[in-house]
Each structure stands twice: as structure tokens, then as C-alpha cells.
């Protein structure tokens, strides 16, 4: 299907339901799908979503609450250090998770290809939280966060915003929740989001390697 036809179909797709289903997750398809605002949410079958409205966060609009300041420098930050361990932790800390073995294998492949990235938090060399997602152009497509210690996922988001501020990124948060709103995220229309992707996904990120943003 041509890009223009897919764009038109997505504008008229269900607002709060899967756009389509697929039997498997394929790395190449995921990259293409993300550029059209699609993301997988469940498996067997894989459900693909493009919700309207869409929740995003602009890094320089991050809200840091007063009670968070004591946590910001409490943990060690590592980038792309142990992606596989982080995504597995995201699965294992949830009683019900769409992150199955196929999902982990596919996203780890995207990591080895340079698309998927992780920001990890450590305390005494123990992984205690973080966030992972895909970087395409100047968009960080957030997939999942995890927090073993208090406020670790919030610290991860704050640190991610700090790193991406100089590069004019947006962060795709997918679906609104109050936790994200407290941090400065907000909803925009699907049409506006897709138009942003047209521009941002075709730009250079501004850095060579994500892991080198922390020296």
C-alpha cells in the first residue's frame, strides 16, 4: 500500500481499538509501522494500534516535582548497557504482560540493528528501573518503563528528557495516563501526531550513538 493511502486510512481508523491484526512480529515491519504511528500492544494475534488522541512528551516541557529532586541523582544511569535484561525485567514485573518471548526476541533484534535503545538505572550494580523504545529520526517511541525502587521510572523519564532536549526530539508515550500527565505529557490529535512523524522521522537524530550521550 502506498504511503498516502495508508495515511488516509489511518486518519479514519478506530480511535480506541486495534487498527489491524497480524500473526507475527517482524523487525522490519515494526520500523515501518512506527513511522506511521502504529505500535503492537498484544500478541497471538498481534494487535496494532494508532490511538486518537495520542500522548506525547516534549523533553523541554518535562515537569519535575519538588519531591523528585532528591531522587534524580540517586541512581547510576547507563545507556544501551543491558537492553535484554531491561526488557525482560519489564515483562517479569507485571502479572499480565504482552511482552512475550517473541516480543523480546524481535525487539532485541531491533536493538542489535540500532533502532531500539534503553536507558537503565542501577543501584549498587543492580538494575532497578529504566525505559526502552525505538529512535527513528527525532522521535523516541517509548515502549515500556519499569521501576523496582521508588520513583525509578520517573527518574528514567527525566534523564531521557535531559539527554534529548538539545536535539529537538519528541517522545511518543502512546496512551495517556495520569502519571505521564504529572510529568508534562499531553494529548494531541492523531492527525497532528502523524504530521509530526512525517517531519521528525525523516530528520537526522543529531547524534551518532545514543549510548554516547552519557560520557
Swiss-Prot record:
GO terms for molecular function: leucyl-tRNA--protein transferase activity. SUPFAM superfamilies: Acyl-CoA N-acyltransferases (Nat). Its main location: cytoplasm. Its EC number is 2.3.2.6. Disulfide bonds: none annotated. It is found in: Cytoplasm. Keywords: Acyltransferase, Cytoplasm, Transferase. InterPro entries: Acyl_CoA_acyltransferase, Leu/Phe-tRNA_Trfase, Leu/Phe-tRNA_Trfase_C, Leu/Phe-tRNA_Trfase_N. GO terms for cellular component: cytoplasm. It is an enzyme of class 2 (transferase). Functions in the N-end rule pathway of protein degradation where it conjugates Leu, Phe and, less efficiently, Met from aminoacyl-tRNAs to the N-termini of proteins containing an N-terminal arginine or lysine. Belongs to the L/F-transferase family. HAMAP family: Leu_Phe_trans (MF_00688). This is Leucyl/phenylalanyl-tRNA--protein transferase. The gene is aat.
